[in-house]
Amino acid sequence: MPSSREIRNKIKSVKNTQKITRAMEMVAASKMRKAQDRMKKARPYGEKIRNVAAHMSNASVEYRHPFLISRDSVKRVGIIVVTSDKGLCGGLNTNVLRRALNEIRTWETEGNHVDACCIGNKGLGFMSRLGTQVISQVTGLGDAPNMERLIGAVKVVLDAYTEGQLDRVYIFYNRFINTMKQMPVMEQLLPLTDDRISSEDGEARPTRAPWDYIYEPEAKPVIDDIMVRYIEALVYQAVAENMASEQSARMVAMKAASDNAGNLIDELTLIYNKSRQAAITKELSEIVGGAAAV
């Protein structure tokens, strides 16, 4: 059994750790609320640009954007993996990376080549160790998604798709369900599917819209720009969801760590009291034995 001094030092060490985890829990709770607000504020823009993109995809008959055209054969797949830069958030990153790994193995088994765009340091490190080619990356976003920093990495993927270097693009991220639940999801970004180009209530739009916009000077550059902005909005929304999930998972993980530290302190205190009681009993027995001998 360890000595009383060793047990006291252990209790002190666990208490110090508990103070840190409690502080991190409170910080994560504050950041979580802000991340949820950012996520909700991003939705109106995403809905509006989706409506515009949906109308353009059906209204303009003179030009069909490449993002809307499905390719017959798929040989090269691009993935955008959204993770956090930091750890201490439970199994959040592990879950989404496991989902991505399963899909990568399936594609490679089918003979497809996979290129990755990594948003977040954890995903970048994982893809580098896995040996997957990383064509673009963004790390150090902090506590708020920055569209200006995301655009460069996303543009590399979009250009690769437009030039035929990628035949399909998917995005992996953690969808925020509630404070206690985050779900790793995979969604197809390119080519845009019917569920992406749909009305706000989820119903598919008619094959031919009854009216169209007036394009100045022509439709092609306007549609090109809108489609790119739409994909950027989808990626931004995914990053915002992942950040809200990250702070929620970190708050829950730090609360669990604080609770476990409290339980460990109780157990160590009990061991310390038993050890101290045994030492006192031993001393009393020695005193009584010595007095009886006299």
Curated annotation (Swiss-Prot):
One of its GO terms (biological process) is proton motive force-driven plasma membrane ATP synthesis. This is ATP synthase gamma chain. PROSITE patterns: ATPASE_GAMMA. It is found in: Cell inner membrane. Its main location: membrane. F-type ATPases have 2 components, CF(1) - the catalytic core - and CF(0) - the membrane proton channel. CF(1) has five subunits: alpha(3), beta(3), gamma(1), delta(1), epsilon(1). CF(0) has three main subunits: a, b and c. It comes from the Bacteria. One of its GO terms (cellular component) is plasma membrane. Keywords: ATP synthesis, Cell inner membrane, Cell membrane, CF(1), Hydrogen ion transport, Ion transport, Membrane, Transport. One of its GO terms (molecular function) is ATP binding.
